[in-house]
Amino acid sequence: MPRRLIDISVALKSGIASDPPHMLPQIEYLDHHQTAPAMAEYMGVSVDQLPNGEYAAVEKVQISTHNGTHMDAPYHFFSTMNHALKPGGEPSWRIDEVPLEWCFQPGVKLDFRHFPAGYIVTPGDVEAELKRIGHTLKPLEIVLVNTAAGAKYGQDDFVDSGCGMGKAATMYLLERGVRLTGIDGWSWDAPFSTTKAKIAAGGDASLIWEGHRAGREIGYSHMEKLHNLELLPPDGFEVVAFPVKVHRASAGWTRAVAIIQE
């Protein structure tokens, strides 16, 4: 049966508004001619003796594990997890401990592009969307959340765009066996700017990072800065998203791909 692969990741790129200013990735590109002198010196030859005076193209990067499309480990959210499953919980898994079984499963897309920036998705919203698409969640399905932020990637207001998943909505997914989710916004939660405004207006500090904090109750992982989710059907596809195995890290860069059987 033929299949179609859809890249649902963004490229690591410097010079665009992909993150807050203090978190932007830096990439230095060295071309074939720039690296030739060092190789020629090491080998004891002249640059002219290398084919066309060239050696290798190389990049130097200064990035966080949370730049680009990446997967957060439970350890990113809180130092312990699974308090709802066992007394006292247990140490949170790092990215090199996330079960590979979580990362290659059938996918489900929730379309929340109509919600305004800063809106916090509720369990009722999730139920209504599942009813609309005619889908019943199954354990280990990968739930992808399509927001208005996806179309803003690289624009100045990207970080402040799109809705976010509240703690209750996240728990709704986890209690049904979901262990990996993803979103095309900068964060799984609502933008920090709108959360800050709500707290300043008298809101509760528990709003801070509430979706992430669900991982303290039931350990899970989510992907952030996904892309092209509007190209996916509501269900009937698979997601492959293995994170880079960074030792004891809170996250790992991920090349996420959706597979549609046609």
What would you call each of these model-derived segments?
Residues 1-262:
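Active-/binding-site microenvironments in catalytic and ligand-binding cores
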